[in-house]
Amino acid sequence: MYSYIRGVLTEKNEDGVVVDCHGLGFDLQMGPQLAARLGEIGTELTVYTHFHITQDSQKLYAFPDKESRKLFRMLISVSGIGPKVAMSVLEDFEPAEFALHVLKKDTKALTKVKGLGKKSAEQIGRAHV
C-alpha cells in the first residue's frame, strides 16, 4: 500500500513516531531503538513502511531502511512470529547481524530476543536460509 513516507519527524512516543507529510500526520509503529536512528524532532526524513492488517487492527510499521523492512517481512512470514516479535528482533539486532546468527544456527543469541523461543529461532533458519 505505502512503500515509504517522506516528511518531517514531529513526535516520538513509546509506540513509535509521527511523521508529517504535507499536513497529514502518519502514526507509525516503531521501536525506540529504531526511532533513535531517525534523528531529532523536526528532522526531514524518509521511512520505509509495511501496512499490516489483522482481524482486530490496522497498523503502519516504519523502518529507517529497506533492509530492516525486508527482515521484518521475512520474519512475519514465519509461522508463529508476528509483528511484535519481529520488531523486537529489529530492536536487538541489525539485519546483517541477525542473518549471521541465523546462518550460524546460533539459537542462544536469537532466543535473547523477547518473545523468540528456540522453536521459532530454528524455524526461521529452516524457512529462510
For each of these PLM feature ranges, what is it?
Residues 127-129:
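Conserved small/polar residues in nucleotide/adenosyl-binding loops
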Residues 1-77:
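Structure-specific DNA junction-binding interface
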